[in-house]
């Protein structure tokens, strides 16, 4: 009995080492998972019931991991069910890698199609809005030029009025200053020459 217990413990330790080695190799490489899983099954067939209990725990872990990966594939990848069936036959790591690569390709295609649609929809809008903007710009330029012209005309009229008023005041001051200095109204030179000529003619007679 003691020898059987020792042998069972020894075989259990060997089974645990084999399962740990298979799990470590599945994490590192994807191609050797199928062969290592067969070795685990062979060890389980030769081991005692205690080792069978340990081997039943390892498939549950692998099944749980595979189910979790299949859930993630179903939630993320909506491309085709055939990819899900093929990934269930392969190892879980390879299925996750293939599902992520498929998702990346599908997302990139959707983004490119959306960008092309947006660019094609924006081009006719800009072509339609161009004449309106040009007309608005032309109207604004015409209004600005008319406003500048009106201001120039008003300034010119004000300048002419000020110049006329200044000339009239200057003439008025000249006439008023000459009359005040002589003590009487200014007499034109033509009248003075006529009077002198008449005086000379009367004196000669």
From Swiss-Prot:
Biased composition annotated in UniProt, kind: Low complexity: 40-133
Membrane topology classification: Single-pass membrane protein
Tagged with keyword Ligase: no
Main location (coarse class): host cell
Region annotated Disordered, chain positions: 40-135
Cystine pairings recorded for this chain: none
Keyword Signal attributed: yes
Transmembrane segments: 147-167
Localization per Swiss-Prot or TrEMBL: Host membrane
Cellular component terms (Gene Ontology): host cell membrane; membrane
Keywords of the record: Host membrane, Membrane, Signal, Transmembrane, Transmembrane helix
Signal peptide: 1-19
Protein name (record): Uncharacterized gene E9 protein
Species per Swiss-Prot/TrEMBL record: Equine herpesvirus 2 (strain 86/87) (EHV-2)
Gene that produces this protein: E9
